[in-house]
Regions:
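Anion (oxyanion) recognition and catalysis
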Residues: 205, 267, 312, 367, ...
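His/Asp/Glu-enriched, well-ordered alpha-helical/loop segment
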Residues: 195, 309-319, 323-350, 354-355, ...
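Short, charged, surface-exposed secondary-structure boundary motifs
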Residues: 248-252, 383-387, 446, 516-518
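Divalent metal-binding segments
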Residues: 3-12, 16-17, 21-255, 274, ...
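Short, Lys/Arg- and Gly-enriched loop/turn segments at beta-strand edges
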Residues: 490-497
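Acidic (Asp/Glu)-rich catalytic clusters
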Residues: 228-232, 260-271, 366-370
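Non-cysteine beta-strand/loop elements that form the S-adenosyl-L-methionine
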Residues: 75, 268-284, 371-381
């Protein structure tokens, strides 16, 4: 005999099917079988919609319920790799950095490395610089020390430099040497990596996220997600992109794409491999903006084309990292060529990742093409000073040009690019509204968007970019019951309260994945 699914009726001060301010909120939402059954204004209507079943009833009082948030470009794996390392995210001075390193390394044996996490940047420090080797040596720790900043930069103390047989007294930028140092430090076990990923995904659920698009995995990393899914421990719905390593030559890129497992069912509710990730240009300091040299490009147009064709044949989807306008144009050329050749039916499966620098003619081309843009304004928030310094005032004024993209009709959704920019969606939404950088005051104020539009970029538009089968990013009958309960209505109140707005409850498929107060455990039946 098939067991009937549990029906739950949630009651709150306001339940929003979407984040449009003109909609009259509901008071009750009925959930069964992981789907939304009904939204009603009265308790009697909710009881009727539950069809007489013995429903669990949860009253969330003054809470506001809305669709769960979706991050279309995140690096949960990078955050997971930092879980066991010295955290520098909260450091504000060189002294803070050194104190964190000292605390992490104190008492360790001489053969144990002290390694910091990557998710910080020297611009957050009052001194605006990295620690020096001399400062690390002065800590007097018995074992080697490596202070990482991002994935491609590290500072070594003298013991670590000796282990690597490098005498250069400057920040290390050689990826191979950084990888060697990490190997010497001792990589975590597969079990530890799996647990660390589960920890990070749980933290993301606590931020109100219900779906993510992980921007690059290899075979071993895919297995981590699969193991959590098979154990029933994935708290979020996860779309994954298969990563072509940055700087790969064409032959290597083709080999990596050929090694990609065939995507599974498009309607897998929790884990999908949806495309290939490739790199076309650099980051803020070396993006392919107008005037940049050829070194800004990781690929030539001739090298990009076979990657696009092989990716579409293998998976039907692709996301290309393109920060500068020239890189965006190169990717768009390849995408339009692929569409003309019939290699893709839905242009929305062809995604440009970042698109932080887009000139008006490029924006018009994007709109006409129908391709998608995963936009990451949090990068501009986090690195506002770098954007101004490397791009100049004019280009900085239109960095992450969300207002222009939306006005032109571009298929655009939001993502964080966390874990170095903030993964917290409410922080990114606040920045989209205020355009106040982490430092240096406003940046790109002319590209601000209204609060409801910012939420739409993290919900309905994000679900459209994912191309999911079941409705998501909205709360309506038949949609996935992915929702978040805020302590207050996020569409109203001072904008500066948004980043700290309490997330009371996060449900994915009607299942609580963040419930610190045990609200769902106290549900009444009847």
């Amino acid at each position: 005999m098939t067991e009937r699914p549990v029906t739950t009726i949630l009651t709150a001060a306001a339940i929003r099917p979407g984040y449009q301010p003109g909609q009259k909120p509901f008071r009750h939402i009925v959930i069964s079988g992981g789907k939304v059954v009904a939204l009603t204004h009265t308790a009697a209507e909710a009881t009727r919609a539950a069809r007489g079943s013995s429903a669990r009833r949860v009253d969330l009082g003054p809470a506001c319920i809305g669709p769960g948030l979706i991050d279309t470009h995140i690096h949960a794996l990078q955050a997971a790799a930092d879980v066991r390392l010295a955290a520098l995210r909260g450091a504000r001075t060189i002294g803070d950095v050194l104190a964190a390193v000292r605390a992490a390394g104190f008492g360790r044996p001489a053969d144990r490395w002290t390694v910091t996490g990557r998710n910080w940047h020297e611009s957050q420090l009052r001194e605006g610089r990295l620690p020096t080797r001399a400062e690390l040596d002065a800590l007097g720790l018995p074992g080697p020390v490596m202070v990482r900043r991002g994935s491609h930069l590290a500072v070594l103390d003298s013991r670590a430099a000796a282990r690597l047989e490098t005498a250069e007294d400057r920040p290390l930028t050689d990826d191979a040497l950084i990888a060697k140092a990490l190997a010497l430090a001792g990589p975590p076990t597969v079990q530890e990596r799996r647990e660390d990923l589960a920890t990070v995904l749980g933290r993301l659920a606590a931020l109100g996220l219900t779906s993510i698009r992980e921007a690059g995995v290899d075979a071993a990393e895919l297995d981590l997600f699969r193991a959590l899914r098979d154990q029933g421990r994935l708290p979020l719905r996860c779309d994954l992109l298969w990563r072509v390593a940055e700087g790969s030559d064409p032959d290597s890129a083709r080999e990596q794409i050929a090694a990609m497992p065939r995507p599974g069912p498009a309607d897998d509710p929790y884990l999908r491999l949806t495309g290939v990730k490739a790199f076309v240009d650099g980051r803020i300091a070396d993006a392919a903006i107008d005037g940049a040299g050829p070194e800004a490009f990781r690929l030539t147009p001739g090298e990009l084309w076979p990657i696009v064709t092989e990716a579409l044949r293998r998976s039907g989807g692709i996301g290309c990292h393109a920060v500068g306008d020239r890189a965006v144009r190169m990717v768009l050329d390849a995408y339009q060529r692929a569409l003309a050749a019939g290699l893709a039916r839905d242009p929305g499966r062809l995604v440009i990742e970042h698109a932080l620098d887009c000139a008006p003619p490029t924006i018009r081309r994007l709109a006409a093409s129908g391709v998608s843009v995963s936009a990451h304004p949090g990068i501009v928030y986090e690195f506002a000073d770098d954007v101004r310094r490397h791009w100049g005032a004019g280009r900085a004024a239109r960095a992450a040009p969300l207002r222009d993209l939306l006005a032109a009709g571009v298929r655009v959704a939001a993502g964080s690019d966390g874990d170095v920019p903030p993964s917290a969606p409410l922080r990114v939404i606040w920045f989209m509204v205020t355009r106040e950088g982490r430092s240096g005051g406003p940046i790109g104020a002319g590209q601000s968007v209204p609060r409801d539009v910012a939420f739409d970029l993290y919900t309905r538009r994000a679900a459209s970019l994912l191309g999911v089968v079941t409705p998501r990013g909205v709360l309506e009958p038949g949609a996935d019951a992915d929702l978040v309960a805020f302590a207050a209505d996020p569409l109203y109140g001072p904008a500066d309260e948004l980043p700290g707005l309490e997330i009371m409850l996060t449900l994915v498929g009607g299942r609580p994945v963040h419930d610190p107060a045990g609200l769902m455990k106290g549900a009444d039946s009847g």
